[in-house]
Amino acid sequence: MLTTLRQDDDAPRSPAPGLDRLPELIELTRAAGLGVEVEITGTAPPLPAAVHLAAYRIIQESLTNVARHAGRARVTVRVTYDDADVHVEIDDDGTAPSDGAAAVGTGSGIIGMRERATALGGDLSAGFRPGGGFRVSARLPVRSSP
């Protein structure tokens, strides 16, 4: 399943994936056995390619992490557009780890997602939710920082 979620079979000359390819990513994820719901709010303004790519990759990595760490958890992907930002939030209903579990963000996945967001002038947080589950929340400016 992780191979399917991380699949990056784009030819070098094909355009980088963006939010326009989110339905395809969600279908691949569902076909791999993960239950995913998607909520989109607002109308997408014209976005720089870097913002499209960062949002897509953050969602892709989050889904990969759910498959790796939360098993068959249910996942909700939310994309919200406003005048200034694209907000991406990925929640799963997996169980929180017992005491002594690895700290959040010690792997390269969350670190890489955070780097993508901050490189564009945005931010990303990730952590366990009270009562169980995990949330990744990113804010990406509609216009990337100069």
Predicted regions and their residues:
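Glycine-rich ATP/GTP-binding catalytic cores of kinases/NTPases
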Residues: 1-146
